[in-house]
Amino acid sequence: VPTENVEAGRAFGCNPLQLLFKVELPLAQLYTQTPLNVPIHVIHGRRPGPVLLVSAAIHGDELNGVEIIRRLLRHSSLNRLNGTLLAVPVVNVFGFIHKTRYLPDRRDLNRSFPGSETGSLGARMAWQFKTQVLDRATHAVDLHTGAIHRANLPQIRADLSNEDTAAMAAAFGVPVVINSVLGEGTLREVAEAQGIPVITYEAGEALRFDESSIRAGVKGVLNIMHHLRMTGPRRTRAPMEPHIARSSSWVRAERDGVFLPLVALGAWLRKGQLIGRISSPFGGEDVTIESPCAGILVGRNNLPLVNEGEALYHIARFEEVREVAQNLEVFTSDIERGPGLTGEPPIA
């Protein structure tokens, strides 16, 4: 990978003992023969330690992670860093340019790992990213949002059978953790297969900035760095103990029509509670939507026009739903009312 030393961190107020490099990982060319690279920020601390990879926009339309990394790189705690931070604001540069989840051939980059040197565009990109970036890491955090028109409550998804991964999930500091299987071809699957603990942070909606989700993400990554002893003493209070979902499921539309949601993300749902309606734009009776179980609403469709079978609500089940709801209220209040960690004005 060709590397270029850029101003030894002065742009980010870095300590002289700290080295910041900007690496350009070459991928491919556009039709115009314009080279396309993935920018990677490499920050070496004052002492040896873990190598933490923080990646975003592996789906090109998931933008909250891009802003999380931008703010992270400006945070003063990096002046006292131990180990190395690898920050990749945009993995899927093709999708990012075109504001889409996918690659030009409609493949999903996060289903293309470990990839190959001679396969499709997605396979080649995955191979490059794995061999040149992921393989250098000891730990990883992958930043995501919901899909287009679908919003996620800030949550961690991780394979909790791995003790190191479970510890990272707890350290991140959001109230909801979903024990998630490792999907075939995902960055998480290939990382865990080679012994790299990795968690996925899911928050917000594609093609939208959400200030609360961004703040929680910045704070969460800093919590991970503290957990790995990459940074000094904590300046904020320790994160609350998260709640692990026993399971989760989607509520789907029973007919086509206009979807009228009646509950917000993070809502505490009771079994049988009215949570939405589907009406016809041409009149007639509404179809009511009831919660099939008690739980917390962790995902929601924000598009009013739905087809039969379309996913509407994602509900996570917990042993102590009341306690989860109370902790979510405290967490949301702290994130929304507290000052931003980088001193920047909030996105309206």
In which residue ranges do the predicted regions lie?
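Structured catalytic-domain cores with a bias toward divalent-metal coordination
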Residues: 18, 23-348
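The alpha-helix within a helix-turn-helix
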Residues: 9
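Transmembrane helix boundary and interhelical loop/hinge segments in multi-pass membrane proteins
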Residues: 1-6
